[in-house]
C-alpha cells in the first residue's frame, strides 16, 4: 500500500506552493489558483494545498510535516538559506537522534528539517 496524497489547509495556496518548490524541491503542478495548488515529492506523493480562512488554519501543537536531508550539512545549508531570506528559524540542534530544526512555514503550519 502506498500513501497517495495529503491535504493541507493553508493561508495562501500559491505562496505555499512556491515556498515548497524553492526550499524543498517539490514539483508544482502549473495552473490552479491562489486557493488550490498541488505539489509532488520525489516519490510522487501528492500534497494538495487548499486555502482556508485564517480562523480555519489551526493545527494541533505537535502537527508538522518533515523533510529528511542526506546529512547534517544539508540541514545547516537549508537553515542558513531560510535565515538569509528573512525567515525566523532557530539554529539546528540534536533532538530525538537527529540534527533538526522546526519553523513556522508560510501557509500556517510547521515544518521540520532533519538529517
Regions found by a protein language model. Give the residues of each.
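Acetyl-CoA-dependent GNAT
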Residues: 50-54, 115
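Short hydrophobic/aromatic beta-strand element in the GNAT-like acyltransferase core
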Residues: 37, 46, 66, 100-102, ...
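A short beta-turn/loop motif at secondary-structure boundaries
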Residues: 32, 56, 93-96
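Core segments of cupin and vicinal oxygen chelate
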Residues: 7-47
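Absolute protein N-terminus
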Residues: 1-2, 115
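Vicinal oxygen chelate
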Residues: 3-11, 57-115
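Short, charged/polar, Gly/Pro-enriched secondary-structure boundary elements
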Residues: 44-48, 57, 108-111
Amino acid at each position: 500500500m502506498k500513501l497517495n496524497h495529503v491535504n493541507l489547509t493553508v493561508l495562501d495556496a500559491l505562496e505555499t506552493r512556491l515556498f515548497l518548490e524553492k526550499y524543498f524541491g517539490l514539483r508544482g503542478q502549473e495552473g490552479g489558483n491562489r486557493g488550490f495548488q498541488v505539489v509532488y515529492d520525489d516519490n510522487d506523493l501528492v500534497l494538495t494545498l487548499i486555502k482556508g480562512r485564517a480562523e480555519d488554519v489551526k493545527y494541533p501543537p505537535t502537527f508538522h510535516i518533515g523533510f529528511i536531508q542526506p546529512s547534517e550539512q544539508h540541514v545547516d545549508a537549508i537553515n542558513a538559506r531560510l535565515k538569509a531570506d528573512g525567515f525566523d528559524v532557530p539554529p539546528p540542534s540534536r533532538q530525538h537522534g537527529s540534527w533538526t530544526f522546526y519553523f513556522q512555514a508560510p501557509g500556517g503550519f510547521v515544518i521540520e528539517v532533519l538529517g
